[in-house]
Regions:
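SDR active-site strand-loop-helix element
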Residues: 21, 63-67, 106-112, 116, ...
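N-terminal Rossmann-fold NAD(P) dinucleotide-binding loop
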Residues: 3-4
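Catalytic helix-loop patch of NAD(P)-dependent Rossmann-fold dehydrogenases
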Residues: 79-91, 113-151, 155-160
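NAD(P)H-binding glycine-rich loop region in Rossmannoid oxidoreductase-like domains
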Residues: 42-87
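A short helix->loop->beta-strand "cap" motif at the edges of active sites that frequently abuts
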Residues: 101-105
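A generic structural motif
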Residues: 13-19
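N-terminal Rossmann-fold cofactor-binding loop
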Residues: 20-29, 44-45, 68
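NAD(P)-dependent short-chain dehydrogenase/reductase
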Residues: 131-133, 143-192
Length: 193
């Protein structure tokens, strides 16, 4: 959802030299052929030696980390806790170390799910109280180093692969839908982010 949208946005802009990394060759078909040469496919992003070598060969000015296991993925397909912690918690810090060595600025995407929602009207000064493994793993992955920016976000948008997100569900409805009362969604679309 987010990684694909961010990749498309920067690939279509001629004022940026963009290289996007995919974890699956099959996803390459989701992008226009004119952009295919701007993609690298690293099927095992957790092959740290290979991934580090590739990043260091690129020497990016800015790296945007969109890698993560989402809450929805965890609910649909139970994933081992070790894998969730590795990708959502440890990987961002490993990536930060490489970016620090290169002088690369790192933008890391986190989530509003580090808050339970019990209090409401949260600000960045509030103490996180994640209710589940997803929120806890994303909180552990947040970066607070020089040359890093962690963005806590809640987004809605089109999913490019499984088409089972909230927006697709809503657009597929042919009649009235039941909703909620007194609920505030303060997220943005992936295009706005």
């Amino acid at each position: 959802l987010l990684g694909n949208t961010i990749s498309k946005y920067f690939l279509e802009r001629e004022d940026y030299q963009t290289i996007a990394i995919l974890r699956d060759y099959a996803k390459l078909k989701l992008f226009h052929k004119k952009f295919h040469q701007k993609f690298l496919v690293i099927e095992n992003i957790l092959d740290y030696a290979k991934t580090e070598k590739i990043i260091k060969s690129i020497k990016p000015d800015i790296l945007i980390n969109c890698l993560g296991i989402t809450n929805k993925e965890i609910l649909i397909n139970p994933i081992q806790v070790e894998k969730i912690i590795t990708i959502n918690s440890l990987f961002p810090h490993w990536l930060q170390r490489i970016c620090s060595d290169l002088g690369t600025r790192l933008i890391h995407l986190s989530t509003d799910c580090i808050f339970s929602g019990n209090k409401g009207f949260y600000s960045e000064e509030d103490i996180p109280d994640p209710p589940d493994i997803y929120g806890r793993s994303k909180l552990l992955g947040e970066l607070n180093y020089e040359n890093t920016l962690t963005i806590r976000k809640s987004v809605i948008g089109h999913e490019l692969v499984n088409k089972k997100g909230l927006l697709e569900w809503f657009l597929d409805q042919t009649n009235f839908v039941q909703g909620y009362k007194n609920v505030i969604f303060s997220g943005i679309t992936v295009l706005e982010l």
